[in-house]
Amino acid sequence: MDFTVKPRRSLIVYMHSMKQVRQLKRFGLIQYQSRKEHYVVLYMDESQIPAATTKIKKLNFVRRVEPSYRPDVAMNFGERVDQGFFKPTTTGAPDDDDED
């Protein structure tokens, strides 16, 4: 019995009112909700994203739906540091040794 990781992704759902948050539970796991900025982060399987997006957009309390781009971003920053992409700048405060 092998364990396989299912690819998952978040959907950011912007809403007019936060009263209907409970209706979004049937689409996936509510990972975060911001009452001040009126959005909900839903977490679900990658294969369910297209179907869920079209269904959620049809709801009258939803302003817009955006997928999360985090799975598309390469998270291996060690190679970029080795290539010199993140070079530290030496424009800081002058050293005290230069005044002598």
UniProtKB/Swiss-Prot annotation:
GO cellular component: cytoplasm
Cellular localization per UniProt: Cytoplasm
One Pfam family per UniProt: DUF2129
Keyword Cytoplasm assigned: yes
Superkingdom field: Bacteria
Span of the signal peptide: none
Predominant localisation class: cytoplasm
Keywords: Cytoplasm
Family recorded in the similarity comment: Belongs to the UPF0298 family.
HAMAP family cross-referenced by the UniProt entry: UPF0298 (MF_01126)
Protein name listed in UniProt: UPF0298 protein lp_2135
Source species taxonomy: Bacteria, Bacillati, Bacillota, Bacilli, Lactobacillales
